Amino acid sequence: MTQPVLDIQQLHLSFPGFNGDVHALNNVSLQINRGEIVGLVGESGSGKSVTAMLIMRLLPTGSYCVHRGQISLLGEDVLNAREKQLRQWRGARVAMIFQEPMTALNPTRRIGLQMMDVIRHHQPISRREARAKAIDLLEEMQIPDAVEVMSRYPFELSGGMRQRVMIALAFSCEPQLIIADEPTTALDVTVQLQVLRLLKHKARASGTAVLFISHDMAVVSQLCDSVYVMYAGSVIESGVTADVIHHPRHPYTIGLLQCAPEHGVPRQLLPAIPGTVPNLTHLPDGCAFRDRCYAAGAQCENVPALTACGDNNQRCACWYPQQEVISV
């Protein structure tokens, strides 16, 4: 069996707080294979970005506690890796595309210098070779006048251009995994589509695995091979993207999809999931979604496991899986 690029198993993480520990991740398991584009979906506070930052080991030291679980990157232990090893991995094995490129790029340095620094940090090549590679990467991202862009500062580029630069940077050292944390949220819809197409094309051409984090099921449906849905720090459904979107089993996934506006239907009243997300400091016993769930029953007083509930290895953490059919 082929070794997965990323393998997360039964991860539990909390942050200390004045009113008790905040249980940000609860028994999270996730796998990504070479060349696969996987979506991680959920509303704000569900644990998506915490998962991404932990994979990169970018959470401040001492600010969190991993109670149990493991993260393996190409078979190597991420959680116990030393800082020197992490510096070698970041960029070369795993890279990240952040939501807001203006805060990710250095505003005081020209684009070309930033790209060349990253390339030469991981590859023993000359400045001339690094410059040529940077220009090639920018041209692959369909950036016009790539040579001119090399001499510009981030603030001189549009949001879409900056995000293309970030994608080029992420691929610059040919990592096996790229984590894209809502990279198109701040972009116009037309620019968003262009950036997604570039990301997908480059990932397919290079065989790079991608973990794509989003709250938008429509975006995920265009890009991802499979999807994991998170709620209150837990994965509550996973499977092939088409199966999860058109045949969701978990009531939360169904609610998430029904909240999306339909194209061509003007002034519709959107349905909403009743109630609020539970306090992660004091999670309820049993299923975290049961107080908001229309299908809740007596079994929901116990925590459900993520088990098979459909075709193509679709799984959901629900005692009463649904048979909903959604048109998206």
From Swiss-Prot:
Protein name: Probable D,D-dipeptide transport ATP-binding protein DdpD
Function: Part of the ABC transporter complex DdpABCDF, which is probably involved in D,D-dipeptide transport. Probably responsible for energy coupling to the transport system.
Gene Ontology process terms (BP): dipeptide transport; protein transport
PROSITE patterns tied to this protein: ABC_TRANSPORTER_1 (PS00211), ABC_TRANSPORTER_2 (PS50893)
Residue ranges constituting the ABC transporter domain according to the UniProt record: 6-257
UniProt topology in membrane: Peripheral membrane protein
GO cellular component, as recorded: ATP-binding cassette (ABC) transporter complex, substrate-binding subunit-containing; membrane
InterPro entries listed in its UniProt record: AAA+_ATPase, ABC_Ni/Peptide_Import, ABC_transporter-like_ATP-bd, ABC_transporter-like_CS, Oligopep_ABC_C, P-loop_NTPase
Induction: Induced by RpoS in stationary phase.
The entry's keywords: ATP-binding, Cell inner membrane, Cell membrane, Membrane, Nucleotide-binding, Peptide transport, Protein transport, Transport
Oligomeric form and interacting partners: The complex is composed of two ATP-binding proteins (DdpD and DdpF), two transmembrane proteins (DdpB and DdpC) and a solute-binding protein (DdpA).
Residues reported to bind ATP: G42, E43, S44, G45, S46, G47, K48, S49
GO molecular function, one term: ATP binding
Alphabetical list of NCBIfam families matching this protein: oligo_HPY
Family recorded in the similarity comment: Belongs to the ABC transporter superfamily.
Gene3D superfamilies tied to this protein: P-loop containing nucleotide triphosphate hydrolases
Subcellular location: Cell inner membrane
